[in-house]
């Protein structure tokens, strides 16, 4: 075949319809080529999914016991614990002129620990809310820093320790102080000294509760016996108190003995000049514990709310008996009931008690 020229009249072998078809084919091919060439440009504007960030899951920290976990991104271990408690109290004028009162408490504790060259660094915060009918109050129950035996902040003193039952009175009713303390520990033995702000403590007539106290304590465990001996001196009242406690596992339970002597009314002890107490916590079953107790007071103060005397002279004695029953319903759910009877020489006899339901976590 002869080569075809560009002019149509010199291509007699191609009809006009065939030429039109060839032109359309060329145009479609050109458009397709441009579309293919422009595809990368449009692809650059497309939305591309970002790579997912790595997730750091919470890790268990077992260096300080159960319940701790690492705060993400740190080497600090944190534990959250606490309890919910419902109580009903009964007794003469328990609340105002009423002989009974119900209340609910929420108690949450945050404990942070980390390793240092001086040993574990501990920080503790306890928030407590007490609900009584429609009124509630939240308080900072404890908050302190502890490292290498040194502790500073708001915390309960050694005087807050007592027998396992409920009715005994072996300390003042204010054992929570802003304090600085050093406690040496070696195995089952400890000894320490504490300087306490006794702002809410006992004060005499004509004075204000604004004083400082110094407390000493030693304690430990030897076999089936544990013990504690503490003393406190109230610098403003210029009086002091000493207390000893001992516990021994005997038979199906634990025997507890305690004694207190106070030189005069002070912020560490002001209920009486001296007292002795005994209890026996009987482990009846895995779930039941029954604890009877008895206590005798020499030179007993019947009403601490109104007493601001300079000494215990002239006061009568008193004796007290009581019983506490503890029952574990299920894991972390407990019930407690207690009742006690007090017979003072200088006041009316008193019978009171309470029932408690508590869920720990």
What are these regions (language model features)?
Residues 104-108, 141-143, 148, 176-180, ...:
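Hydrophobic, lipid-facing positions within transmembrane beta-strands of outer-membrane proteins
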Residues 67-200, 217-221:
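Outer membrane beta-barrel
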Residues 209-320:
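Detector for outer-membrane/organellar transmembrane beta-barrel domains
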Residues 88-94, 116, 131-133, 158-162, ...:
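Gram-negative outer-membrane beta-barrel proteins
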Residues 84-88, 125-129, 152-156, 193-197, ...:
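Transmembrane beta-barrel strands of outer-membrane/channel proteins
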Residues 2-81:
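N-terminal periplasmic/intermembrane-space "pro-region" immediately following the signal or transit peptide
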Residues 41, 327-329, 349-361:
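Outer-membrane beta-barrel "beta-signal"
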Residues 117-120, 148-152, 188-193, 222-229, ...:
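Repeated loop/turn-to-beta-strand initiation elements of outer-membrane beta-barrel proteins
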């Amino acid at each position: 075949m002869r080569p075809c020229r560009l002019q149509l009249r010199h291509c007699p072998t191609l009809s006009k319809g065939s030429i039109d078809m060839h032109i359309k084919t060329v145009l479609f091919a050109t458009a397709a080529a441009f579309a293919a060439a422009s595809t990368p440009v449009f692809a650059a504007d497309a939305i591309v999914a970002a790579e997912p960030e790595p997730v750091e899951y919470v890790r268990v920290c077992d260096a300080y016991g159960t319940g701790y976990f690492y705060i993400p991104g740190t080497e600090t271990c944190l534990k959250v614990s606490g309890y919910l408690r419902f109580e009903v109290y009964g007794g003469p004028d328990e609340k105002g002129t009423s002989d009974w009162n119900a209340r609910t408490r929420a108690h949450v504790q945050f404990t942070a620990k980390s390793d240092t060259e001086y040993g574990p660094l501990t920080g503790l915060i306890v928030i407590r809310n007490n609900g009584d009918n429609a009124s509630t109050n939240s308080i900072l129950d404890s908050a302190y820093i502890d490292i290498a035996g040194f502790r500073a902040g708001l915390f309960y003193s050694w005087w807050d320790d007592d027998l396992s039952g409920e009715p005994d009175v072996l300390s003042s009713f204010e054992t929570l102080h802003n304090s600085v303390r050093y406690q040496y520990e070696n195995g089952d033995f400890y000894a320490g000294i504490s300087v306490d702000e006794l702002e809410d403590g006992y004060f005499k007539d004509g004075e204000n509760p604004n004083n400082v106290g110094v407390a000493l304590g030693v304690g430990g465990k030897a076999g089936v016996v544990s013990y504690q001996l503490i003393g406190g001196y109230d610098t403003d009242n210029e009086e002091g108190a000493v207390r000893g406690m001992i516990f021994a596992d005997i038979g199906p339970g634990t025997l507890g003995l305690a004694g207190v002597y106070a030189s005069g009314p002070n912020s560490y002890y002001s209920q009486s000049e001296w007292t002795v107490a005994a209890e026996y916590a009987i482990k009846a079953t895995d779930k039941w514990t029954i604890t009877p107790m008895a206590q005798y007071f020499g030179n007993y103060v019947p009403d601490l709310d109104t007493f601001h005397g300079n000494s215990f002279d002239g006061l009568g004695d008193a004796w007290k008996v009581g019983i506490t029953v503890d029952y574990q319903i299920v894991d972390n759910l407990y019930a407690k009931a207690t009742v006690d009877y007090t017979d003072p020489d200088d006041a009316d006899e008193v019978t009171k008690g309470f029932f408690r339901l508590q869920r720990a976590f």
